[in-house]
């Protein structure tokens, strides 16, 4: 069984009339998939067909096959094409022979195309029922997330939510055709190697975004800074000054000359483009994610240490109740003697240092709420000061 390059292009409602793709898209799309069976064209799903803005606006075209030009999903690797060269050559040869047959044989061409469509649908049903399909889909979507602008990422999630509809379609086909998930070593080999290929491609894309693309953005920024230092004009800067008409004309001519030199050199605008801003935002998100992953363990350890110290600083509730009881009974003079402290140590099981710290903090908390104790303290200090002054005399 051979797996052709279009086996990952799920049948969706993609037969909208669309204008022909531009030349750049035509160069990138060497493989055109055949039209799906009619029974699969009733779906409103748009499973990972990310190029839908242009197709929805252009419904007056007469070329149904151009729907494949806007499809992102499923451009299989080159090793899949090499494995099917013989089959493709045979199909092309048979097609040429049929074309030479008179017009009465056109029905044979239609039957041949219909058989190819159902064969492709059968292969897709086998792929979707394979145990590695979820891993294959996850690896492919991971590559898409790297190459997709940040503001377009929610569209991938929205289309992933419709994946069950696609699986249900091909499950119906599989049940109707009586397909059984048997021991297909070729399919297992294909699924395993394709998942590994996508994972490797994801790493290459990440390396490109983090290193090469960021270097290109920084190089453009350095060029802008150099131009600004040479000319003294910053991006989007206005003069805001009042000049005479002659000076205005001179400045205007200089500005036109400066703009022309920029166009001639091909530097383009000095302000970042939307793609550059999206790329810088993606790099920032990637670096933020890496920093979180790299310092996650240290952050967790520091948090646990802080919580442990907080828990260690709090005394048990039964011990504080004993200390509070003593405090309330001695509210006029909340200064325990050494004998009182020794008795509290025996009753609470705390250390002498802990008891001293608790009374210090308790007096600070109740310094203004207990005027009687503060008055007694002041009177005692005054009496002690008077006795000391009398002795000095």
Swiss-Prot record:
Self-association and partners: May form heterodimeric complex with the TALE/BELL proteins. Interacts with OFP1, OFP2, OFP4 and OFP12. Interacts with KNATM-B.
PROSITE patterns assigned: ELK, HOMEOBOX_1, HOMEOBOX_2
GO cellular component: cytosol; nucleus
Listed PANTHER family: HOMEOBOX PROTEIN TRANSCRIPTION FACTORS
Sequence ranges of Polar residues compositional bias: 1-13, 368-377
Top-rank taxon: Eukaryota
Name this protein carries in UniProt: Homeobox protein knotted-1-like 4
InterPro entries per the UniProt record, alphabetical: ELK_dom (IPR005539), HD (IPR001356), Homeodomain-like_sf (IPR009057), KN_HD (IPR008422), KNOX1 (IPR005540), KNOX2 (IPR005541), TALE_homeobox (IPR050224)
Protein's gene: KNAT4
Major place of residence: nucleus
GO biological process: response to light stimulus
Location within or outside the cell: Nucleus
Protein's UniProt keywords contain DNA-binding: yes
Matches recorded under SUPFAM superfamilies: Homeodomain-like (SSF46689)
UniProt KW keywords: DNA-binding, Homeobox, Nucleus
Pfam families recorded: ELK, Homeobox_KN, KNOX1, KNOX2
């Amino acid at each position: 069984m051979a797996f052709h390059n279009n086996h990952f292009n799920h049948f969706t409602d993609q037969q909208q009339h669309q204008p022909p793709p531009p030349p750049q898209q035509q160069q990138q799309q060497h493989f055109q998939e055949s039209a799906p069976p009619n029974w699969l064209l009733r779906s409103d799903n748009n499973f990972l067909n990310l190029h839908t803005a242009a197709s929805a606006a252009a419904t007056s075209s007469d070329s149904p096959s151009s729907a494949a030009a806007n499809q992102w999903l499923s451009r299989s690797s080159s090793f899949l094409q090499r494995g099917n060269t013989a089959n493709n050559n045979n199909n092309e040869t048979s097609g040429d022979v049929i074309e030479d047959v008179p017009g009465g044989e056109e029905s044979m061409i239609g039957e041949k195309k219909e058989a190819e469509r159902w064969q492709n649908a059968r292969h897709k049903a086998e792929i979707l029922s394979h145990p590695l399909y979820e891993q294959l889909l996850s690896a492919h979507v991971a590559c898409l997330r790297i190459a997709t602008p940040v503001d377009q990422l929610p569209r991938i999630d929205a289309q992933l939510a419709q994946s069950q509809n696609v699986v249900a379609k091909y499950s119906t086909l599989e049940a109707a055709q009586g397909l059984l998930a048997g021991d297909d070593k070729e399919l297992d080999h294909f699924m395993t190697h394709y998942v590994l290929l996508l994972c490797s491609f994801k790493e290459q894309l990440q390396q490109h975004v983090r290193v090469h693309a960021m270097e290109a953005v920084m190089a453009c920024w350095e060029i802008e800074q150099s131009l600004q230092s040479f000319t003294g004009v910053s991006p989007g800067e206005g003069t805001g000054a009042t000049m005479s008409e002659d000076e205005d004309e001179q400045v205007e001519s200089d500005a036109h000359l400066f703009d022309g030199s920029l166009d001639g050199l091909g530097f383009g605008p000095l302000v970042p483009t939307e793609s550059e801003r999206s790329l810088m935002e993606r790099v920032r998100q990637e670096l933020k994610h890496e920093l979180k992953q790299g310092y996650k363990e240290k952050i967790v350890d520091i948090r646990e240490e802080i919580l442990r110290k907080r828990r260690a600083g709090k005394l048990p509730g039964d011990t504080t109740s004993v200390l509070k009881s003593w405090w309330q009974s001695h509210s006029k003079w909340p200064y325990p003697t050494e004998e009182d402290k020794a008795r509290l140590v025996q009753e609470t099981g705390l250390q002498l240092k802990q008891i001293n710290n608790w009374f210090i903090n308790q007096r600070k908390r109740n310094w203004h709420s207990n005027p009687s104790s503060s008055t007694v303290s002041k009177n005692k200090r005054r009496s002690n000061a008077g006795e000391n002054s009398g002795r000095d005399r």
